Amino acid sequence: MPQISKKGLELPQSAIRKLVPFADAAKERGIHVYHLNIGQPDIETPKGALKELSEKALTLPETHGVLEYSHSAGIMSYRRALCNYYHKHGIDVTPNQIIVTTGGSEALQMAFTVCLNPGDEIIIPEPYYTNYNTFAKLCDAKIVTIPSDIKTGFALPPIEDFEKAITPRTKAIMICNPNTPTGDLYTHEELLKVAGLVKKYDLYLFADEVYREFCYDGHEHFSVMQLEGLERNVILFDSVSKRYSACGARVGCMVTRNSEVYAIAMRLAQARLSPPSFGQIFGEAAVNTPQEYFDAVQKEYIARRNVIVEGVNKIPGCFCPMPKGAFYTVIDLPIDDSDKFCQWLLTDFNYNGATVMLAPATGFYEDPERGRHQARITYCICIDDLKAAIKCLEEALKVYPGRTR
């Protein structure tokens, strides 16, 4: 039998999706599963964007009759619309500094492929989004983590810790802001300190900013694209998935003012031919979504966040920090092993015919032991379901055999 590649075998499982077969089996047994494991919003997708997508799809047979490839960098009118969007957020770029991608994940993979050599190191605060590790391994690059602490709400670690981690193989620093999995939001002052290191050691600065719209309690988002003197260093990843509750559109983008990075990334863009045309049509229409939509969405997420934080912190032995952005947080649990506990919830437990699905935090750390007693949870379902999910968690911890305190 032909053998699987060594690289393929080394790829990590998704901390977010690896327990899906157990959730599917629970549903087959008639158990209702509350999904707090995945950032799939239940917020309504903007109707105006869906309507425009539908109208263009319906008129395609009469107007042209062919669903063509787009330009490999994306439809020009969409890239212009993205420039207008970024300008409103204080970021000035041109269409020829944007490559539209199949979700933000492809943008990440493109940048890693273009910028990283085997053995190069990327410094990332942890816990961190599990897919970063997958794409780093595909490039034979190494992630070097800087631990943050749940007691501080996973605030950005001291900049001195970053500098101590820099070696001759360090090629980049990566941040996610607002952050998944922690919900933390880095300030302008913190980003300026990171920028200082990037300049001092001539590094790339990779920035995942897909949760830009989701900042709470008066906190404001500051983009790394607004940092001066880093035109050749910064590569931004973005996506329509969470911003417009349109994960299935599979459209994102890579943005950079580094013309050399852009030119080489275009080789990859051409090799994969083009991003999804219907997704781009949706994305262009969604750029015109009124601010009232985001105001209502933000209000809803704040209410959901508060339910999660208050509810989890009332459970004996649990701790949930207060997220400043996105719709995730990592919680501390009185358990022996988060992988075993999260699987047990799906295989051996139900409360009145329901259970809750969490993402074990072991997959968000370079050293799984650091996440052994933690889980990432999302607040992407309605408040009534969140309350029911928290009740399931509370009852589960009363009977879990591996409870530690």
Language-model region placement:
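Active-site phosphate-binding strand-loop segment of PLP-dependent enzymes
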Residues: 149-217
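Helix C-cap/helix->beta junction micro-motif
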Residues: 26-29, 139, 200-201
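Conserved glycine-rich beta-strand-loop-beta hairpin in the small C-terminal domain of fold type I
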Residues: 284, 301-309, 320-333
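Conserved PLP-anchoring active-site segment centered on the Schiff-base-forming lysine
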Residues: 114-136
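Structural signature of PLP-dependent enzymes
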Residues: 263-269, 286-309
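N-terminal small-domain helix-loop-helix segment of the aminotransferase-like
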Residues: 2-103, 110, 286-289, 399-405
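PLP-dependent enzyme catalytic core of the Aspartate aminotransferase-like
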Residues: 92, 163, 344-357, 364-405
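Active-site PLP attachment segment
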Residues: 226-263
